[in-house]
């Protein structure tokens, strides 16, 4: 509808989602416009908020919206893709997107669903090859995540590579029942190397946590300081930026505090379109 197209121009102007630098490449904005329009269409059809006279809310449950102004570039992106949707076998898809990749995407199993239900969500490298890499072991993923020269489209994005240090005291704020925490190990990885299960070992037992969202939550803490790809730091996040992680045990000090370094990449769930990947690809003229 016309109202939906108008709201897309406001949505694409939203710095929270796109970021100022994203406004540079109009082709990337067009890709975002089509994804957002398809997402909106699916929510309208789902009608989950019918009792409120709405289709979505303006939280992270659906799409954050801060009533910002539009830009000429965002208006152009919406107008030049007017009415276009992403479809698979004639049906509009679940058009997922996220901020930044680690250089590889994952598939629909990231939310615990059968990936056969979303065959268009594929685990591939975010570069000109677009092939699935073997990243199922910790050794393979360690080599991948510690390589900053992968040739990925979003390699210049601030969150393409990041690392942080946590310890057993910080972790105990969210993880109890295992005593003093002495070990963290990713025991299963999904397509693209995303952490699927995490084993936490302590002096009095162990626990296993499953799903990327749960792993990001229990390992995250607002006190953690992240060193990012741009060699600056950021702090204050409740959860890890992504579950594309490798963890190294740094040993236990004289106070019996065990430290861990988390090497990570990307920001978001990793399924669908990387917004910064689209930006990087747009810069190449593709």
What is each of the regions a protein language model found here?
Residues 1-286:
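Conserved, single-site charged/polar hotspot
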């Amino acid at each position: 509808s016309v109202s939906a197209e108008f709201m897309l121009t406001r949505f694409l102007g939203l710095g929270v989602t796109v970021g100022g630098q994203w406004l540079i490449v109009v082709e990337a904005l067009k890709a975002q416009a089509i994804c957002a329009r398809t997402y909106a269409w699916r929510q309208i059809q789902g009608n989950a908020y019918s009792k409120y006279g709405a289709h979505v809310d303006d939280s992270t449950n659906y799409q954050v919206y801060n009533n910002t102004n539009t830009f000429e570039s965002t208006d152009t992106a919406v107008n030049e893709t007017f009415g276009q949707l992403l479809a698979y076998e004639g049906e509009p898809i679940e058009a997922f997107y996220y901020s930044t990749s680690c250089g590889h995407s994952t598939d629909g199993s990231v939310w615990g669903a059968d990936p056969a239900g979303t065959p268009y969500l594929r685990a591939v490298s975010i570069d000109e090859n677009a092939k699935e890499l073997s990243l199922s072991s910790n050794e393979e993923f360690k080599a991948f995540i510690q390589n900053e020269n992968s040739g990925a489209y979003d390699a210049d994005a601030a969150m393409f590579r990041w690392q942080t240090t946590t310890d057993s005291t910080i972790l105990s704020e969210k993880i109890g029942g295992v005593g003093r925490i002495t070990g963290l190990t990713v025991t299963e990885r999904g397509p693209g190397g995303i952490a699927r299960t995490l084993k936490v070992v302590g002096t009095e037992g162990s626990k296993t946590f499953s799903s990327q969202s749960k792993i990001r939550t229990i390992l995250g803490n607002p006190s953690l300081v992240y060193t990012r790809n741009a060699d600056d730091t950021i702090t204050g996040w409740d959860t890890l930026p992504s579950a594309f992680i490798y963890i190294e045990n740094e040993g236990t000090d004289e106070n019996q505090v065990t430290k861990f370094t988390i090497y990570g990449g990307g920001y978001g769930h990793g399924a669908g379109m990387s917004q910064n990947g689209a930006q990087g690809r747009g810069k190449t003229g593709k």
